[in-house]
Structure formats: structure tokens, C-alpha cells
Amino acid sequence: MAADGERSPLLSEPIDGGAGGNGLVGPGGSGAGPGGGLTPSAPPYGAAFPPFPEGHPAVLPGEDPPPYSPLTSPDSGSAPMITCRVCQSLINVEGKMHQHVVKCGVCNEATPIKNAPPGKKYVRCPCNCLLICKVTSQRIACPRPYCKRIINLGPVHPGPLSPEPQPMGVRVICGHCKNTFLWTEFTDRTLARCPHCRKVSSIGRRYPRKRCICCFLLGLLLAVTATGLAFGTWKHARRYGGIYAAWAFVILLAVLCLGRALYWACMKVSHPVQNFS
């Protein structure tokens, strides 16, 4: 009895002869071992696996499945693809053809798929940021906080001259703050207000000297007139009080003219530097 138990197989024999049971043995239902007993053996190839449907290639048991790819098969030809201008990856533009640019899913940078709008152009910053600006722009700044690079686009192709005339004038040095500014009013009244200190000065000495002499002579004449009027009407002033008012009026005019002459004499003078055209 013990010998029969030792010779019994480790796996029970299949009920149906070998294809569908849990215990599988070699062909013919048994395999002869070295000691005359039965030993388990591998099933025939394909006996334990259901057949694949027709039209699909079989995958071997030890073979890995093909890698997953989100891209559409080239055989379908339904999804339009473009190449990223930064990392050269493929970008699916299906449903995005109405846009001017698309974003790459690998490098997160924009790539144009259409021409820029009329009057605009695309510029790629060295940090790979895609910018859009006017065709006539010569300098643009990158908006990214960590870049802020100023990009010089260079001169644009020649076109018609600008209808706005170039500023014509003289560069002068302010007599107050010594800063340089442009003076464009070519008139006899050579007064100019400095845009830096907002103070008025004269361009050259000719105009304030002329005004100073005129005001001084007029004030001197009024002073002489007031003196003569006072001596000539001294006796009548005691009788007519209005004569005192005439004296005061003439004296006031003389003082104003002499004060104006002093103002022109003390005015700061701004000196021209060079012509500007």
C-alpha cells in the first residue's frame, strides 16, 4: 500500500484526456520518469490558450505589448500634425485650425500654424517665447518676468517717408539748470521755458538787453515827467486835490518801467549749442 502511494502521480489525471483540466500531464496521459513514476510535463503549444480572432496577429506569451502612443496611426491619415518649432515634437492640430498658434504639450511653447494677422509679425525670443508685434516695430520687450529681454529687430525695409516733419530747432543750454533742451520757436521774442526746471530764460543776450534799455529809458522819461509835473503844479495842488493823483499815477508808471528794466537786466541767458535737423 505504501509503495502504491509513492508511485501515484503528484497531479491528478485530467477528466477529458488532457486539454481542459487543472492537472496536465504529457501526451498519452502519462510520462515515464527515471523511477518509473509519472511526472508532470508542459502542455502542447497553444493547447492552454484560446485562439485569437481572425484578422489580428497573435502575441507570443513572453512578448511585451506594443507601446502606447497618443498619436494617430499614419495609416489613418485623419489627424493633421505639425512639428514644434522649439523641441521638434509632433503636435496634433485637429480642431485647432481656426487658431493662429498652438501650444506644444512637451515644451509648453507656442508654434504658429497660420500667418500673422495683417500688419503683424512673429518674433521668437531667445527664451523661446513667441511674440507678435507690428511689422514696423524695431524694438520689443519679452513679457516673461524672468527674461524681460529687449529685442532689437533692426531696420525695416525702406518705405515711403513719414508725413511728419523732423523737428527743426536749436539745442541750447539752460541758464538756470544747465540742462540741454530743444528750442523750436524762431521769433523775435527769444524767451524759452526749460522743460527740466520749468524756468524762463532768454536765448542769447540781444532780446533782454533791448527790452532792458527800452524799459529803462521809458522809466527815466516818466520819472523826469513826474518831477517836472510836481514842480509845475505845486501851488495848484493845494487847491485841487486831483493833481496829487496825477503825480502818483506818473510816479507809479516810472517805478514799474524801472522795475521791468531791472527784471530784463537780471534775466538768465541760455546759450545755443548746435543746430538740430
UniProtKB/Swiss-Prot annotation:
Inducers of expression: By sterol depletion.
Region (Disordered) residue spans: 1-74
Chain location of the short sequence motif CX5R motif per the record: 133-139
Catalytic activity: a 1,2-diacyl-sn-glycero-3-phospho-(1D-myo-inositol-4,5-bisphosphate) + H2O = a 1,2-diacyl-sn-glycero-3-phospho-(1D-myo-inositol-5-phosphate) + phosphate
Main location: membrane
UniProt entry tagged with the keyword Ribosomal protein: no
Protein name: Type 1 phosphatidylinositol 4,5-bisphosphate 4-phosphatase
Organism this protein belongs to: Homo sapiens
Gene encoding the protein: PIP4P1
